[in-house]
Amino acid sequence: MFKKTILVAALGAISAGAYAADVELYGVVDTGLKYTHEKWQEKSAAGKYTEKDQSFTMESGTNSATRFGLRGSEDLGNGLKVGFKLENGFSSDTGALGENRIFGREASVNVSGDFGTVYAGRMGILRSDTGSVGFYGAMASAFGSGWSDNIAGHTFVMADYVSRRDNVLTYVSPEFAGTTLYAQYAMGGDDKIGSENKTTADRYAAIGAKWAGGPFEVGALVDWQNKSNRDVTINNYTLPRGSYSIKDAYTVNLAGSYDCGFAKTYLALQYFKDANDVAGLIPKAASIVGDKDAEQVMRLLTVTGYGVHLSTAFDALGGSWKAGIGYMDGDADLHFAETKGFNGDIKAYTASVGYEYALSKRTMVYTGMGYTQRELDMTYAQENRKDTVKGFDFAMGLVHRF
């Protein structure tokens, strides 16, 4: 009897411990095929140059980012809980590690109570649709942040979208009257030329709010980037201080959705001031001049303008359909003494459609196509040049969640 009593007590203790501190392994595997066609065109007084490229590839994470992770929490009592999330991104088509990090998608710890929840670590920004705190992206577009480069969501026509940041503090309030408040500060990452929370690192801050009531959901967010003051080096030449200026950037964002029963419609608006990365200009510039020089040049080029994206989701033919269109317009300035008189106009367009069909609660197949177009019209020294990049994607694949 005594041994049975000890056994029952031990099992009870183990059960209580498992209840107080639970850990979950989860993940998503998305593998599919994608056809891409892209066309680059440059027009100037010297003539017209055109380059085309097409590819048919196996891809990972087109519809949903391929990932696995661990998350858990422990009840500390007195209304307090501590939790964590460690999430790895990888390519299911090759097995390669994402972002060269073990937990590149998220590595965070949190404490929650009646006051709300405080998070610390690497995580998604509030404006994203990823991780523990990215609330804005899911209400801004039926495609979220987008399926692929050309099956795009609202972020294609919005500015300065970096989905995750290092050394982040985030506060999420308790919900009251359908409203949740958010605040976030990112101290920047340590590297060879930048130090965390110092002027040599890019720092980031955001505040936002979300309200939900009945069929309506509305979100608003303002974010700001304090850009680093480190030297600008192009072609191994460091520009003299005073010959250029680095402008801090901010964006004002408003999004909402309405579910009328047979369809859910999304609208996202953004005003951006002195933004650097607009319509994917940095990746496109990097492909021409190299990653390092492209980043340096883009630090001097800022864009002020607006973006708008409209999308909808509805059920038909046994599955879920998505469709969206977007437009962006901005004026570009190059903040370098030797390029006075530079004027630039940037426009971007996107149109996408997608279809998802559930095979079970955890498995689905999808297909979609999308078109994007970027235009950069520049005038400098009485010369005009127009660059146009057009892209088309057709994709299909399978997603399994565990």
Functional labels for PLM-detected ranges:
Residues 29-35, 84-88, 122, 183-187, ...:
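Transmembrane beta-barrel strands of outer-membrane/channel proteins
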Residues 207-352:
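Detector for outer-membrane/organellar transmembrane beta-barrel domains
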Residues 389-402:
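Outer-membrane beta-barrel "beta-signal"
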Residues 52-66, 102-105, 163-167, 201-205, ...:
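Residues that define the transmembrane beta-barrel architecture of outer-membrane proteins
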Residues 21-35, 55-190, 201-203, 210-217:
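Outer membrane beta-barrel
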Residues 80-82, 115-119, 178-181, 215-220, ...:
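Repeated loop/turn-to-beta-strand initiation elements of outer-membrane beta-barrel proteins
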Residues 1-22:
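Gram-negative bacterial Sec-dependent N-terminal signal peptides
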Residues 10, 69-71, 108-110, 170-172, ...:
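Outer-membrane beta-barrel architecture
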